Swiss-Prot record:
Entry keywords, A to Z: NADP, Oxidoreductase, Porphyrin biosynthesis
Cross-referenced InterPro entries: 4pyrrol_synth_GluRdtase, 4pyrrol_synth_GluRdtase_dimer, 4pyrrol_synth_GluRdtase_N, GluRdtase_CS, GluRdtase_dimer_dom_sf, GluRdtase_N_sf, NAD(P)-bd_dom_sf, Shikm_DH/Glu-tRNA_Rdtase
GO MF, one annotated term: NADP binding
More details: During catalysis, the active site Cys acts as a nucleophile attacking the alpha-carbonyl group of tRNA-bound glutamate with the formation of a thioester intermediate between enzyme and glutamate, and the concomitant release of tRNA(Glu). The thioester intermediate is finally reduced by direct hydride transfer from NADPH, to form the product GSA.
CDD domains from the UniProt entry: NAD_bind_Glutamyl_tRNA_reduct
Active site: 48 (nucleophile)
Protein name: Glutamyl-tRNA reductase
Keyword Glycoprotein: no
UniProt comment concerning the protein's domains: Possesses an unusual extended V-shaped dimeric structure with each monomer consisting of three distinct domains arranged along a curved 'spinal' alpha-helix. The N-terminal catalytic domain specifically recognizes the glutamate moiety of the substrate. The second domain is the NADPH-binding domain, and the third C-terminal domain is responsible for dimerization.
GO term, biological process aspect, one: protoporphyrinogen IX biosynthetic process from glutamate
Family classification: Belongs to the glutamyl-tRNA reductase family.
Pathway assigned to this chain's UniProt record: Porphyrin-containing compound metabolism; protoporphyrin-IX biosynthesis; 5-aminolevulinate from L-glutamyl-tRNA(Glu): step 1/2
Enzyme Commission number, as recorded: 1.2.1.70
Amino acid sequence: MLVVGMSHRSAPVALLERLSMDDSVRGQTTSALVERPSLSEALIVSTCNRLEVYTVTSSFHTGVNDVVEVLHEISGVDIETLRGYLYVRYADAAAEHMLVVASGLDSMVVGEQQIIGQVRTAYQQATEAGTVGPALHALAQTALHTGKRVHTETDIDEAGASMVSFAIDRALTQMGIDPASDKPLAGKTALVLGAGAMSSLAATHLGREGVDKLIMANRTRERAERLASHSLEAGVPAEVVDFADRASVLDRVDMVVSATGADDFTVKPADIPAGVQLMLVDLSMPRDIDDACAEVPGVDLVNIERLHRAKREDPTGAAAEGADALAIVREELEAFTSEQRIRDVVPAVSALRKRANELLLDELDRLQARTPDISQEDWKEVTRTVRRVMDKFLHEPTVRVKKLAARSGSVSYESALQELFGLEAVQTTAPPAITSVNASDLPDAGIVAIVNSPSTTGQSVSVDGS
């Protein structure tokens, strides 16, 4: 298992913007990934705050390099730039990362619920595209189950925090309004551009904050009308304007929230009437609103980049909020990795039984050739007896090897033999040879930065293979 990605923690927004993928590009990219001989499965999580490629690879070095090359080919970002900002997690560390992400623990707003839906969508799309196999099926389902447990069994999202609420609270603060006050948007009108998930969340949150009126605009007018009807049902007055006429209402609103993912800017400086006091909130990646709008007198702007900056300056509460959630992640990760280790040992057990059966048949053929006068009844009894001995001899190690595989860490060859065959420990006077070492005794090698550095011992090595 391998994950190669970048997020708000590792990369500037401008670079995340260049790597942002819509559904079409994401499908194209996963297909390109599994065409590489080293990669057998692929799933991509692409949001405004992260781009992560989850894969199953037959070779760590080759797999990482193949992922980086595909990202370069799809995005046009040069490989050296990618190397400077991408992070890599491998094996159990990769599995843990998806569980942490799906639980909202790696989000800019810790505990936000949108990410679990985004992981689910990524999984569904990759499944439909045929780029997900047994390993990623098991991992994605475990991650979604873990995320659900975190949100139902802890208080991590008690405050209902999300990227949308964080952005609007930030906008209110910049407007000189206390977000914690009762109905802080009372007497205000807001324009919502777009009618997707983010826009719907924004409209709902604006309604809860007491906005007097919402104006909706979307390229497909019917979707804007549907969103407006939901607002009306919630008791918030709403109207719809054609998307092409959105600039005509800017002198009537106090706030604009844009989440369209459009190719062109939805709001430009030339669209803004002179003398207005206007708060612009851009929730899109790539960005919807031209940064130059913030230079217009009376206009302020909140966007993903500015939210990142604000969160870095005030990262409060993350550790306390995530303690209980991390305990759930650890529990689910242990169960997942145990199941994977058991699954991985099954082919070896099958091969052992197959080989034992082949040897048994060979020996029976040899015995039959050497005892031609043995009666048919006696031969059947010999065959049954030999097969019973083989089955009894293999039964215990077959059961025990699965239990042994389920444990984390490693054991010595001597201990493995004793465990598999139920043997009593043999006391020796000579010091035992060192045949294994626990991963916990080594430096943490589950996380690798993609840099041109010397090779390291363990799970991780430098990307350039030096």
